[in-house]
Design a protein with these regions (language model features):
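Charged, terminal alpha-helix-loop-beta segments
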Residues: 1-177
Length: 177
């Protein structure tokens, strides 16, 4: 399984311009206005995997998860992006960052998280500012799991269905176990 470790997945995002461009596209921002800062420290010693700047203001704080996680680590990631939203709402920054009004807290992970687990990502509470991104580790396509997809997943509460991560963007496929 590629990108099992969070550090390897972070390295991929930090080094791949196409992934960075796709993230900018999901966030509806121009790549030329983009700057990515890795392992940025916020209050209480919280270290964000990435801070994404647009015109020198914080546009997003990104939490990465490696491919070898289970439900507990996924929920921990949700907690982290809730905290990032709190930083935005209260203008909390050790470095006196300004925040964009269209700020997003981002949770990003490889497709293996959905393929290899039985939990339903539609049955969690997420912050209002959230963007959930899945990166296909084979073709490096970035997919935004939007509110419509989360709603479809919420409707399949029973365990007879599982999400299969797509090989292309903007597809959500279910299969019966």
């Amino acid at each position: 399984m590629p990108y099992r470790l969070e550090k390897d997945f972070q390295d991929l995002i930090a080094s791949n311009n196409n992934i960075q461009k796709d993230i900018c596209s999901v966030l509806e921002m121009d790549y030329k206005d983009f700057k990515l800062l890795r392992e940025d420290t916020y209050i209480n010693g919280i270290i964000a995997d990435f801070t994404l700047f647009e015109r020198n203001k914080v546009r997003a704080i990104i939490e990465c998860k490696g491919g070898a996680i289970g439900v507990s680590e996924y929920v921990r990631g949700i907690g982290q992006i809730f905290q990032y939203e709190y930083f935005f709402e209260n203008h909390l920054s050790l470095k006196n960052y300004e925040f964009c009004q269209n700020f997003n807290s981002v949770l990003v992970f490889p497709e293996s998280v959905l393929k290899n687990n039985d939990f339903n990502v539609g049955l969690f509470k997420y912050p209002k500012s959230k963007k959930i991104l899945e990166i296909n580790s084979h073709n490096l396509a970035v997919r935004h799991i939007n509110d419509n997809e989360l709603e479809k997943l919420r409707e399949t509460k029973h365990r007879d269905f599982k999400v299969i991560s797509p090989c292309t963007r903007n597809e959500l496929v279910f299969y019966k176990k």
